[in-house]
């Protein structure tokens, strides 16, 4: 059995186990800020990603076995400007190693229409693009930001959200639970995703987020995207330790 696990109860500056890309940074109060904040105010047209520094093997071409995994994290989205439209949201994603940050806005930094790469993602979308259903919503994304399945949720503005994402390799079901403790609300979504058909054997796992309107016409189309804690574990049958 090949296993990997890690746990960030909080984040430390100069954290060697994380790769920070574009505007992502770790604040002085140990929060992973995916998009830019200046003097406490989120900025527009910002994109950032944070990846676990080591690759994770999600399937084995020799045995055909696929890994099951579970990840838990807490996040907070603060929307100081309710008008016109806060944007855009954050995602947990799995993609091939060494991918470049994608387009911002509704592409969340994980998709580039001109040079796409395979990915699986769970989005927490706060802005309605032309391809989106009602907002905010949770979406399961496979190689596209047009989600295969969605469910709406009510955001606790500035509050803590707890997320559990589980993948069962035997059933190929990706299951997501979102909880806002202060509101007492729970949202769930699940879909079948065949990781072996979508992704290479080794991948990166992490987060990406973007604020809105690259044109700059609506500079209030923004919000914070903060990750407060993160754990991940995966097990791949029939192989040795990572």
From Swiss-Prot:
Q: Mind listing the GO molecular function terms for this protein?
A: carbohydrate binding
Q: Which PROSITE patterns match?
A: LECTIN_LEGUME_BETA
Annotated glycosylation sites: 45, 220
Give UniProt keywords alphabetically: Glycoprotein, Lectin
Q: Which Pfam families match?
A: Lectin_legB (PF00139)
The record ties this protein, via InterPro entries, to:
ConA-like_dom_sf, L-lectin, Lectin_legB_Mn/Ca_BS, Legume_lectin_dom, Leguminous_Lectin
Q: What does this protein do?
A: Lectin.
- Family membership: Belongs to the leguminous lectin family.
Q: Which PANTHER family match?
A: CONCANAVALIN A-LIKE LECTIN FAMILY PROTEIN, LECTIN
Question: Which protein are we looking at?
Answer: Basic agglutinin
Q: Which organism is it from?
A: Psophocarpus tetragonolobus
UniProt lineage = Eukaryota, Viridiplantae, Streptophyta, Embryophyta, Tracheophyta
Q: Which gene encodes it?
A: WBAI
